[in-house]
Amino acid sequence: MLIPKKYYLLIILLSNCLLASCSINTPNPSNIALMQLTRENNYNLKWHSHKYLVKKINHYRTNGLFAYLSRNKITYANFNWQQISTNHYRLVLLNMIGNAKIDLHILPGLVKLIDFQGQSYLNEEALARIKILLGLDLPLNELHEWILGLPGQATNLTFNQQGYLHKISYHYHGQHWNITYKSYHEDKIPALPDCIEIRQDNNLIKLKMNEWSMS
């Protein structure tokens, strides 16, 4: 049976349209790679803009809830964290009735701890005391960076869609630390952490920042 010429031309036209449609819908690997690169560059731009604003912060204060969970111990406390001067940080852990459990000062070359009995410890003794109290060799020199949502010396990082830190992977004294930022205070400019989880092996520290204030 012969196909009329006008139908034959119509079939050819429809076939070409179908082929063109298929070629449009078929992912092009180079296009995918370009989209991924564009997305990564966008995240990097957001991150560097955010980091620049955070690094300009000084003389701040935050407070909230502290939880430490391990196989053998669970501790809950209120906490106050403060940047007193350029390189002077203070962490106070309080029990639920407001009495200080730990008063910790961190300065370049100096760590001072006052425990709940009023006993003072300096440097190596202070670090040893913290390890006894928490069961952790806590990287104090990184802590002030992590609290602000900065990576410190860590280079293994992931970001959320807003360009803020989402996860940090860090090695310290033979220990592997994972820091996860669960949420941020989006009402702040720049946005600052709202909930942080700091995990080392079976040890977990949770920080819930109720508020931030800048002086």
UniProtKB/Swiss-Prot annotation:
Keywords, sorted A to Z: Cell outer membrane, Chaperone, Lipoprotein, Membrane, Palmitate, Protein transport, Signal, Transport
Protein name: Outer-membrane lipoprotein LolB
NCBIfam families in the cross-refs: lolB (TIGR00548)
Entries under InterPro entries matching the protein: LolA/LolB/LppX, OM_lipoprot_LolB
Residues of the signal peptide: 1-21
Similarity comment: family membership: Belongs to the LolB family.
Organism placement in taxonomy: Bacteria, Pseudomonadati, Pseudomonadota, Gammaproteobacteria, Candidatus Palibaumannia
HAMAP family reported for this sequence: LolB
Organism, as annotated: Baumannia cicadellinicola subsp. Homalodisca coagulata
Membrane disposition: Lipid-anchor
Chain residues carrying a lipid of type N-palmitoyl cysteine: 22
Self-association state and partner proteins as the record states: Monomer.
Residues bearing a lipid moiety (S-diacylglycerol cysteine): 22
One annotated GO biological process: protein transport
SUPFAM superfamilies the record matches: Prokaryotic lipoproteins and lipoprotein localization factors
Keyword Chaperone (UniProt): yes
Task performed by this protein: Plays a critical role in the incorporation of lipoproteins in the outer membrane after they are released by the LolA protein.
Coiled coil: none
